[in-house]
Amino acid sequence: SDQLAAAIEGREIDLALVDASTALFLERYDRVLVEGAGGLMVPIRDDLFAIDYIESRRLPLVLVTNGRLGSINHTILSLEAVKARGIELKAVVYNRYFDKDSVIAADTHGFIERYISRHFPDCELIDIPVLN
């Protein structure tokens, strides 16, 4: 987690610096990605999760998922949290690298695609193929 990485370094995450850096990039570029890792409920600090940061800054979200066991549950829980917080969902990226079983992969992808089309009709589903 971000919190653990900061603790290991003996530092605290400076959100004002992150905000200032983001603003600087937004002045220079049309699109800026602020990347998190580990999910929406990863702690940045004891009192702040990634989803809190996204919500408070009104950042549009691109959610990344895959076909691993449990990913339907993880993805739907994340999407429900996004909806409850009123966060704008731009896209869901489906990473096919973890598609080890074609039947399970097709079912997982299909379920997520149907869910998004019903609950987030303006959201794009983007497939990332395996690159050899």
Please annotate each region the language model reported.
Residues 2-44:
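Phosphate-binding/switch loop-helix module in NTP-utilizing enzymes
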Residues 36-120:
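Conserved catalytic-core segment of NTP-binding enzymes
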Residues 125-127:
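Conserved beta-strand scaffold positions in the cores of enzyme catalytic domains, especially
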Residues 10, 120-122:
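Short, flexible coil/linker elements and helix-boundary hinge sites characteristic
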